[in-house]
């Protein structure tokens, strides 16, 4: 009798344990939550900057000089991207496939983003209200409509650490992100392209990208027609295992396409490597040479698989030298609403001093 009484309890415990284990496994193979909140798109990019900082991939870097507009943003919100941003997920809408594509935007891609980090909500709301031409309310969330370069960027604070934005004309896009953020996170959720191909992303990847490739030069932001003769899907990822390991798979329609694509990519890399060795003086950078030496491209069934190992020293050099190439742009005429406001205040101060 005791065995019969205990049997249902044991079965119930086993069922609960199996359900929990299944949920954990599904969550491991599901895209990160910021990516699952994104709308349907032609490409997706995700970066886990929090893990990258903890892994100290780039090491100690010199101080980065800030653009005046960015410095104003930091002072107003207290948020510094290189310090406070933990996760970023980006959806890329190709021009031909954007729901709001028109004659004026035929060659311009559109983007939707979800950011996770250390956010001061009150300061960020105050900053967004200053920039917004209007504020909408949807499901208790405020949507800030910010005019920028002839378009409207819609921004919404989803939670204590999450912000979403989109520059698509359709207001339903940002509302869809808000609606998904208020539902219980499901490992089965997310855009169809991610649900289909995220399983190809290696486990513990710090960053990855999944995007469609069309041979037409006007189909996406980057023209791939010199490599791809037919449509394909690319899955790229980055992992850190003492060094940065990069892997990109171009999933094609068959084995012949994969072989031809591998040959074209291999020839392109050989030409690029030869050109780099020729222009480098007095000799090629050892980190760049190590990168090119590690490059491998080979067909695997219906895929062309490219792998490479990026030395940490090369990453440090790129990040350390990047500010030098952007600092001259700080003198360019401001085009965003932020500098126009600061410029207006400066003009008023000048008039006061003259009086």
Regions flagged by a language model, labelled:
Residues 24-42:
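Ser/Thr/Pro/Gly-rich low-complexity linker/stalk segments immediately outside membranes or between
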Residues 8, 282-355:
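Extended terminal
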Residues 56, 60-85, 134-243, 257-258, ...:
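An internal, short helix-loop-strand segment that often contains or flanks glycine-aspartate motifs
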Residues 54-56, 120-126, 255-262:
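Short, conserved charged micro-motifs
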Residues 34-38, 46-50, 54:
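N-terminal, charge-rich interaction modules
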Residues 45, 81-189, 248, 306-326:
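Single conserved position on a long alpha-helix in the C-terminal lobe of the eukaryotic protein kinase
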Residues 231-239, 245-295, 299-304, 308:
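Extracytoplasmic/luminal low-complexity segments enriched in Pro/Gly and acidic/polar residues
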Residues 1-16:
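N-terminal Sec-pathway targeting helices
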């Amino acid at each position: 009798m005791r065995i019969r009484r205990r049997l249902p309890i044991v079965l119930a415990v086993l069922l609960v344990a199996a359900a929990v284990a299944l949920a954990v496994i599904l969550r491991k193979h599901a895209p990160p939550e910021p990516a699952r909140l994104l709308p349907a798109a032609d490409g997706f990019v995700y970066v886990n900057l929090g893990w990258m900082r903890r892994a100290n991939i780039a090491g100690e870097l010199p101080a980065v000089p800030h653009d005046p507009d960015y410095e104003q943003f930091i002072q107003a919100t207290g948020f510094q991207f290189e310090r406070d941003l933990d996760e970023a997920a980006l959806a890329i809408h190709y021009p031909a496939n954007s729901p709001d594509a028109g004659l004026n935007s035929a060659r311009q891609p559109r983007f939707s983003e979800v950011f996770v980090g250390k956010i001061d909500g009150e300061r960020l709301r105050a900053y967004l209200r200053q920039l917004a031409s209007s504020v909408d309310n949807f499901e208790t969330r405020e949507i800030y409509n910010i005019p920028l370069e002839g378009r409207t960027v819609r921004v919404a604070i989803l939670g204590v650490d999450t912000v979403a934005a989109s520059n698509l004309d359709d207001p339903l896009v940002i509302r869809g992100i808000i609606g998904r953020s208020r539902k219980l996170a499901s490992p089965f959720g997310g855009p169809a392209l991610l649900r289909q191909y995220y399983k190809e992303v290696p486990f513990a990847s710090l960053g990855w990208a999944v995007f469609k490739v069309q041979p037409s030069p006007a189909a996406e932001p980057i023209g791939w027609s010199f490599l791809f003769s037919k449509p394909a899907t690319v899955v790229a990822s980055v992992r850190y295992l003492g060094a940065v390991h990069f892997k990109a798979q171009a999933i094609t329609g068959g084995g012949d396409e994969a072989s031809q694509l591998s040959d074209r990519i291999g020839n392109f890399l050989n030409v690029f490597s030869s050109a780099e060795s020729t222009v480098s003086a007095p000799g090629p950078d050892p980190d760049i040479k190590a990168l090119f030496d590690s490059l491998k491209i080979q067909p695997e069934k219906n895929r062309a698989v490219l792998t490479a190992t990026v030395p940490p020293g090369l990453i440090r050099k790129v990040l350390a030298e990047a500010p030098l190439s952007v600092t001259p742009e700080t003198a360019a005429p401001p085009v965003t609403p932020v500098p126009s406001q600061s410029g207006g205040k400066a003009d008023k101060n000048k008039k006061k001093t003259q009086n």
